[in-house]
Design a protein with these regions (language model features):
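Glycine-/small-residue-rich active-site loops that bind phosphorylated ligands and cofactors
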Residues: 60-61, 199-203
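Ubiquitin-like/PB1-type beta-grasp interaction modules and other compact soluble beta-rich domains
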Residues: 1-86, 96
Length: 245
């Protein structure tokens, strides 16, 4: 059988390509894909303990069986945080009118925090908590010129949407919006925005903190940091054990 393999972040650099077509015997599993690349590309072996695997945009274990035509994504640890760009709403990170119920968006245009906050707030809210992740000008003493974000886009949007839904169930909040920007970002620009509306501030703060912490560990988005003396993919923590194959 034949499967399509996708590489992201540092794994894309190690492989020297963004994707591959891999021939496997019938009955093969995710483990067979990992073993193949550990042999073909030795540096992959050092990353196996930290990466996650998605099959058809869902996290998968090592024993997950594959079938012909599957899309297998090899995901290095994430380092941060699909909008449909139609008019100002989408460009600012909101699905148009929010009538579709979508609470998560991935965009390439600047994020308009004021507009998104205005769309979220309602008269019966007692608090609106806003978190902006901003591009800073240095990392561990190295001067940063700019950042470049990439994502496994559709899966990332789905994961962000799932986080929003989970937050609505687990915290006493009324509404939430998550937006992450991709592409080149300059110093001071907003890379990720979370807005939480609630009756009381404590629930809003708790939900916002949980959302950004979980997004940064589980949503497949990576950033490359460009310095005066070179560029590197930002190191992320290993995926949670329940996600890793």
């Amino acid at each position: 059988m034949r499967v399509r393999v996708l590489f992201f972040g540092m794994l894309k650099d190690l492989a020297g390509r963004p994707s591959d077509t891999l021939e496997l015997p019938d009955g093969a599993s995710v483990r067979d894909v990992l073993q193949h690349y550990a042999i073909e590309t030795p540096p992959f072996k050092e990353s196996l303990a930290m990466l996650a695997v998605a099959v058809n945009q869902e996290y998968a274990g090592a024993e997950t069986a594959l079938k012909s035509g599957d899309e297998v994504a090899l995901l290095p640890p994430v380092s941060g945080g699909s909008g449909r760009p139609v008019g100002r709403d989408a460009a600012s990170g909101l699905p148009s009118g929010r009538a579709s119920g979508l609470r998560a968006s991935i965009v390439r245009d600047p994020i308009d925090t004021t507009l998104i906050l205005a769309n979220i707030k309602r008269g019966d809210d007692g608090a609106a908590v806003v978190f902006e992740g901003v591009v800073r000008n240095q990392t561990q003493g190295r001067r940063t010129l700019y950042l470049d974000y990439e994502a496994y886009e559709e899966m990332a949007r789905q994961q962000m949407e799932a986080l929003a839904e989970q937050a609505l169930k687990e915290f006493q909040i009324r509404d939430v919006a998550l937006v992450h920007r991709l592409g080149r970002l300059e110093i001071g620009e907003v890379s990720v925005l979370i807005v939480v509306a609630s009756a009381h501030r404590a629930a809003g703060f708790d939900a916002c903190r949980w959302l950004i912490d979980t997004l940064k560990r589980t949503v497949p988005i990576w950033k490359k940091e460009y310095f005066e003396d070179g560029a590197v993919w930002a190191a992320g923590e290993p995926f949670p054990a329940e996600i890793r194959p």
